[in-house]
């Protein structure tokens, strides 16, 4: 909307990422680009979308560290955006990153992030002479400060271990939820497609059957010191847009999904407590 491009909403598939067939149905001659959200760290099937010959922007806010067919997310020809917000696998507290293989795009982005200046702060400070910048475009300040950047860079050394710990914790949750699903109407939300050759386990979510009121489940769990929250939000239903579009899988996650407490250092004892409290709540509400 901010750049004159009204969004066209599309559904997600069972993996929580944009549903190729639904997008194809909505593409028109006016389609300028497709934004592919690598939701919860699950990559989209890029090869399928490549066939459409439409510019793509990858939203990998949750995807840092995951791989698509043996290549890290972001290793494509498209613009790719990342978030390093506090709950991400690699964090700088706040902030993010944009990557591109296009030199002209990169130069434009560097200018846009720094008030629209023609000279980067690094170029100006390293110059052996007076370097006068000019402002070629109207923009604002989107630069990441040096200290948060250093914090993120330092984590790269231990990032593989971070993913290993998350994988171990995620697989343990999977085992426990599968056991619960034999007696309760719940299912694992973290379904991983075969083309995802490395999953970063950004978070752990599950989907409750419609017999349960998800909000009540979350409320009771939180009162019992289980810091869960509701799942993926349906952005087309937010007040900023409030569009009437039929997106059934999106609404399933929106209405019945929840995130369990999840981080690399979570202990087995903590996970067992979460599962036991969840079991108690499901017993209480069914």
Question: Where are each of the predicted segments found?
Answer:
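Short beta-strand-to-turn element immediately C-terminal to the catalytic PLP-Schiff-base lysine
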Residues: 82-83, 96-102, 153
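PLP-dependent aminotransferase-like
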Residues: 1-63, 67
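PLP-dependent aminotransferase class I/II
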Residues: 19-25, 33-37, 67, 103-286
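Short, conserved catalytic or interaction motifs in soluble domains
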Residues: 12, 86, 262
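Positions that flank functional sites
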Residues: 15, 64, 89, 235-237
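Structural detector of well-ordered beta-strand residues that form the stable sheet scaffold
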Residues: 8, 56-57, 81, 187-189, ...
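Conserved active-site segment immediately N-terminal to the catalytic lysine
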Residues: 58-92, 107, 131-136
């Amino acid at each position: 909307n901010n750049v004159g491009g009204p969004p066209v909403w599309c559904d997600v598939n069972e993996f929580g990422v944009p549903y190729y067939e639904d997008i194809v149905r909505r593409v028109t001659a006016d389609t300028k680009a497709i934004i592919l959200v690598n939701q919860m760290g699950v990559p989209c099937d890029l090869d399928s979308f490549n066939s459409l010959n439409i510019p793509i922007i990858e939203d990998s806010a949750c995807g840092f560290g995951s791989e698509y067919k043996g290549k890290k997310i972001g290793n494509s020809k498209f613009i790719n955006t990342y978030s390093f917000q506090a709950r991400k696998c690699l964090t700088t507290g706040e902030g993010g990153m944009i990557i591109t293989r296009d030199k002209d795009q990169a130069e434009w982005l560097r200018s846009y992030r720094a008030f629209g200046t023609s000279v980067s702060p690094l170029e100006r400070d390293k110059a052996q002479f007076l370097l006068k910048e000019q402002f070629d475009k109207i923009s604002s300040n989107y630069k990441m400060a040096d200290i948060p950047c250093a914090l993120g860079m330092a984590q790269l050394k231990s990032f593989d271990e971070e993913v290993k710990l998350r994988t171990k914790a995620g697989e343990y949750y999977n085992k426990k939820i599968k056991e619960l699903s034999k007696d309760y109407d719940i299912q694992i939300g973290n379904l991983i497609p075969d083309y995802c050759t490395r999953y970063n386990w950004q978070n752990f979510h599950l989907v409750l059957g419609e017999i349960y009121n998800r909000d009540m489940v979350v409320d009771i769990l939180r009162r019992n010191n289980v810091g869960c929250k509701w799942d993926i939000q349906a952005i087309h239903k937010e007040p900023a847009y409030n569009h009437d579009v039929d997106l059934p899988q999106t609404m399933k996650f929106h209405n019945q999904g929840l995130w369990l407490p999840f981080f690399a250092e979570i202990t087995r004892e903590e996970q067992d407590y979460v599962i036991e409290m969840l079991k108690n709540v499901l017993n209480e509400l069914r």
